[in-house]
Curated annotation (Swiss-Prot):
Gene3D superfamilies: 2.60.120.200. Keywords: Cell projection, Glycoprotein, Hearing, Repeat, Secreted, Signal. Pfam families: EPTP. Residues 1-20 form the signal peptide. PROSITE patterns: EAR. This is Thrombospondin-type laminin G domain and EAR repeat-containing protein. InterPro entries: ConA-like_dom_sf, EAR, EPTP, TSPN-like_N. The gene is Tspear. It comes from the Eukaryota. In the organ of Corti, expression at postnatal day 1 (P1) is restricted to the basal region of the stereocilia of inner and outer hair cells (at protein level). Expressed in the organ of Corti at P1 and P7, in cochlear ganglion, stria vascularis and vestibular ends at P7, and in inferior colliculus, remaining brainstem, cerebellum, brain hemispheres and retina at P1, P7 and in the adult. Also detected in adult liver, lung, kidney, intestine and testis but not in heart or skeletal muscle. Its main location: secreted. SUPFAM superfamilies: Concanavalin A-like lectins/glucanases (SSF49899). Residues 59-278 form the Laminin G-like domain. GO terms for biological process: hair cycle process; Notch signaling pathway; regulation of Notch signaling pathway; sensory perception of sound; tooth mineralization.
Length: 670
């Protein structure tokens, strides 16, 4: 009681900006709020909910038919105002089966339905319990995820979890054991508005990710940590704060021996400092690695990670505004061993610039004359280092060619190596097949004709030059991407326009007996980029669709806001199948990157039909949910994204096709 009063006093003193000068008052009752009881009718009978009894203990199971039947408006418990408490705990008693890998299930979600935004969520995967919440600041809205390593949860036995949240401190207590604390550098927001929001129990509104286990207790305790109220408990796995009336009767008697045998962790030893030895004598002891924030258990003779010391992406911060010679259509980041990290910018006007990473910033290093340069490609052949530029425009004498430059280790500059005749070149791709080196150019158009050949060139080791090897018919080719799957080599082209329509097929080719042959075609809409990436064993191909336009149907169908598509390779069927549609605004580029064990895609959104000021979006891989938007970045005519690492951390750089300004962003990891 007195602790609660003190808390109220503290909240009173701090106040919160958006609640104005009004005295602080809690938005809800400060007693335990039985969220589960809100969705259970008193007689226990409703479609979508079933009562089951396991180990002599009653719980509820939800069915996939209608997540809405297990939801209720937040206003039902937020009776006096609309703010989620800044400090609270959530108490859950549940019994969950083993989940297949990659599967995730929601225990609870709070959704702002109009915006379809997850305000708060609790979900678990085979090894982790994730607490998600929305934080908003001037830079945009963020979904933050705090993850607890909890592989012991999925053993088909009852467990009681207490998640206590207070600003940046997140603490999880399992079965009244030792709490695991995570200090995050993103705090739970002091003013999370729940106006118009809805609680969903056992789902996040969709049938996908529906909770398949049994739930007995789900309580929100505003204002305080429930642990002292529940623990220690004689029956820690079923410690109870509040459960719905219908679940109250325990028919079977819990096995007393089981309770007594439960390993209380009271005499658990945690060692700090550098890695201590782990032998039989240290068995079952813990070591906390303070530097990496990892908690390890000595099991047998090895330290086993309990609370994983992993890096995760928290947010991005602006690192450098890079003022460029002119608008930048493409950026290529590469390193030269022993020299450093470079970024080549393809600039629209007469000169393109190469920057070198110096004292944590890109600094101008070399300028090269180019003609409406569209992109650069870095590649190596043996010890030789090359950089090829795709020139879109002709030179002063009306000649059209693109140029390969070679790094001179003596001059420490790139020098002209070979000119190749091209037609409004958009992109170069470099690759190796069976030990031979190739380049392929995307010829966009010749005069007004977009239906022309693009060309594959082979490196001739005797002449030490690239020579034409295969021509491939393309329609307004914009981008080539090479990748391999096992022993097979693939090349995919983004075809933009065939003279009358942007709704054309982009083609994927496979290398068979010395040449590329058609493997699969995809209907694309002004395709500007293909990005290939792997997540574990899975292989994905994402296309950036920039424009839907057709001369014949101009009026009905001239749109920049359309879906870009992610395909996944089905190895059995030997074909890429649609995996996910993502709405984009004239998407020009996809970039895939990883931070720790998390995977992300960022899209260059460039135009919505009216303005070039559109947000580019970072998506996070969330397993069965696919890619989920986690961050918006205001961009202007965004054209190209690149991810790179230095010893100081991970970065993204993006260019603008509409202003002479590129930006370097640093990925904040925790
Ligand atoms: C371009 O594509 C459209 C739609 O696919 C098709 O109707 C039209 O005939 C094509 N035009 C040419 C010149 O291939
Ligand atoms: C292209 O290169 C491959 C690999 O060296 C070779 O087998 C093939 O004959 C070449 N084709 C042409 C037309 O030069
Ligand atoms: C208009 O474009 C969309 C793709 O953005 C496509 O799905 C639809 O079929 C097109 N409609 C017509 C009439 O071509
Ligand atoms: C892959 O294709 C095979 C054969 O068409 C099909 O049976 C299987 O369900 C597909 N796998 C996935 C994951 O879609
Ligand atoms: C950067 O480093 C991370 C490891 O933290 C790695 O997963 C990622 O692939 C690297 N990215 C690039 C672009 O090299």
């Amino acid at each position: 009681m007195s602790a609660l009063l003190m808390l109220c006093a503290v909240l009173l003193l701090l106040g919160t900006p958006s609640r104005g000068a009004r005295p602080w008052e809690p938005c809800t009752d400060l007693r335990p709020l039985d969220i589960l009881a809100e969705v259970v009718p008193l007689n226990g009978a409703t479609s979508g909910i079933r009562m089951v009894q396991v180990e002599g203990v009653r719980g509820l199971q939800f069915s996939a038919t209608e997540p809405r039947t297990t939801s209720f408006p937040a206003s039902r418990i937020f009776s006096s105002c609309d703010f989620f408490p800044e400090e609270f705990s959530i108490i859950v008693t549940l019994r969950v089966p083993n989940l297949p890998p990659k599967k995730n299930e929601y225990l609870l979600s709070l959704l702002a339905e109009e915006r379809d935004t997850l305000l708060l969520g609790l979900r678990y995967s085979p090894t982790q319990l994730h607490f998600l919440f929305l934080s908003e600041d001037l830079a945009g809205a963020w979904q933050t995820r705090v993850s607890f390593w909890s592989p012991g949860l999925m053993d088909s036995r009852w467990h009681t979890l207490i998640l206590a949240v207070s600003q940046g401190s997140f603490s999880l207590t399992t079965d009244c054991g030792l709490p695991v604390d995570i200090m995050a550098d993103v705090s739970f927001p002091p003013t999370l508005s729940v106006r118009g929001a809805r609680f969903f129990i056992g789902s996040r509104k969709r049938t996908k990710g529906l909770f398949t286990g049994v739930i007995r207790q789900l309580v929100l305790l505003p204002g305080s940590d429930a642990t002292p109220q529940l623990c220690p408990s004689r029956n820690a796995r079923l410690a109870e704060l509040s459960i719905p009336q219908v679940l109250k009767r325990l028919t079977g008697k819990p096995d007393d021996n089981e309770v007594l045998n439960y390993p209380y962790e009271a005499d658990m030893k945690v060692t700090l400092g550098s890695r201590p030895p782990c032998t039989k004598a240290e068995g079952a002891q813990f070591w906390f690695d303070a530097a990496q924030k990892g908690l390890y258990l000595c099991a047998g003779s090895e330290w086993v990670s309990v609370l994983a010391a992993k890096t995760k992406l928290d947010y991005v911060e602006e690192h450098q505004s890079l003022h460029t010679n002119s608008e930048t259509l493409g950026i290529e980041v590469f390193s030269i061993p022993g020299v450093g990290l470079f970024a080549a910018a393809a600039n629209r006007k007469a000169r393109s610039a190469i920057y070198k990473w110096t004292d944590g910033k890109f600094v101008s290093y070399q300028n090269i004359a180019t003609h409406q340069a569209q992109s650069w490609r870095h590649f190596t052949i043996g010890k030789k280092i090359f950089l090829a530029v795709a020139n879109f425009g002709p030179n002063e004498r009306g000649q059209e060619f693109s140029v390969i430059y070679k790094w001179s280790p003596r001059k420490l500059k790139f020098t002209l190596y070979q000119r190749i005749a091209t037609h409004s070149a958009r992109d170069w791709e470099a690759f190796e097949v069976d030990g031979e080196h190739f380049l392929v150019v995307a010829n966009h158009r010749e005069g007004d004709n977009h239906n022309i050949d693009s060309m594959v060139y082979r490196w001739n080791p005797s002449s030490q030059l690239f020579e034409a090897n295969q021509s491939i018919a393309t329609s307004g080719a914009y981008d080539w991407e090479f990748f391999t799957v096992g022993p097979y080599s693939f090349l995919v082209v983004a075809n933009t326009f065939n003279g009358t329509s942007t709704q054309v097929h982009s083609h994927l080719y496979i290398w068979l007996v010395g040449a590329f042959q058609l493997f699969q075609s995809f209907l694309t809409f002004g395709a500007a980029d293909w990005e290939v990436f792997h997540i574990g064993e899975r292989i994905f191909l994402a296309v950036a669709n920039s424009h839907s336009y057709d001369v014949q149907m101009q009026a009905q169908n001239d749109s920049y806001v359309l879906s870009s598509v992610i395909y996944e390779l089905n190895i059995t069927a030997q074909t890429f199948v649609k995996f996910q549609d993502i709405p984009t605004c004239s998407a020009l580029d996809w970039e895939f990157f990883s931070v720790g064990e998390d995977h992300f895609l960022v899209v260059a959104n460039s135009f919505d039909g009216n303005t070039f000021s559109v947000n580019s979006i970072i998506y996070r891989w969330q397993g069965y949910e696919g890619f989920v938007a986690v961050h918006k970045l205001p961009t202007f005519g965004c054209r190209d994204w690149e991810a790179f690492n230095t010893t100081a951390g991970s970065y993204l750089i993006y260019s603008s096709a509409k202003e002479p300004l590129s930006r370097v962003l640093k990925l904040r990891t925790g």
